[in-house]
UniProtKB/Swiss-Prot annotation:
The gene is rpsU. It comes from Zymomonas mobilis subsp. mobilis (strain ATCC 31821 / ZM4 / CP4). Coiled coil: none annotated. This is Small ribosomal subunit protein bS21. Keywords: Ribonucleoprotein, Ribosomal protein. NCBIfam families: S21p.
């Protein structure tokens, strides 16, 4: 990953770096890897995330179609 510092503006370069790291999911990965996660816990977490995604998709579809 490369960030260009223009006109010695380090603050702007740091903001750009943080934004890139956020988009790449580095912070989320660091948070998950702080402690060991058992495979069963990982499966449960991923399953719960899939359920949340599917519910959100259903809500969006219902809202788009005008169904409550």
């Amino acid at each position: 990953m490369q960030i260009i510092v223009r006109d010695n503006n380090v603050d702007q370069a740091l903001r750009a770096l943080k934004k890139k790291l956020q988009r790449e999911g580095v912070y989320r990965e660091m948070k998950l890897r702080r402690h060991y996660e058992k495979p069963s816990e990982k499966r449960a977490r991923e399953r719960a995330a899939a359920v949340r995604r599917s519910r959100k998709l259903e809500r969006k579809r219902a809202e788009r179609d005008g169904i409550r």
